[in-house]
Amino acid sequence: MSVPNTTRMKRRPTHPGEMLREDFLPDYELTVSRLAEAVDVSRQSINELLRGRRAVSPEMSPRLARLFGNSPEFWLNAQRAVDLWDAAEAIKKDVARIKPLRTA
């Protein structure tokens, strides 16, 4: 039996929209409008993503991956980390009441 990973990050992972806003847009000299046009989505969708109000979806990840030369998994894994953190924070009191099983 393997030992589970019980370590927990102390802070919320960086939202992929923040990565886009702080790293990718400046590095590629992109505006919101140019990014929206490049990936063929609305400026509103990009704005919501950049502000962390929208998640990177399975439909958006290949668009971003193609544009920036990385993988859809890069974007989805970043989003998954945020989603897991948010879910764990929302139910942490409930989870704390669960008694772990012990092996015989």
Language model features by range: what are they?
Residues 76-104:
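Short, charged recognition helix plus adjacent turn
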Residues 29-48:
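Short alpha-helical DNA-recognition segment
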Residues 26, 37, 66:
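Alpha-helical residues within the helix-turn-helix
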Residues 1-3:
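General marker for long, soluble alpha-helical cores
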Residues 42, 53, 68, 79-82:
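The DNA-recognition helices of helix-turn-helix-type DNA-binding domains
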Residues 53-66:
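Short, basic-rich loop-to-helix N-cap that marks the start of a DNA-contacting helix
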Residues 48-51, 77:
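Base-recognition residues in the alpha-helical recognition helix of bacterial helix-turn-helix
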Residues 5-30:
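A short, Lys/Arg-rich alpha-helix, primarily the initiator
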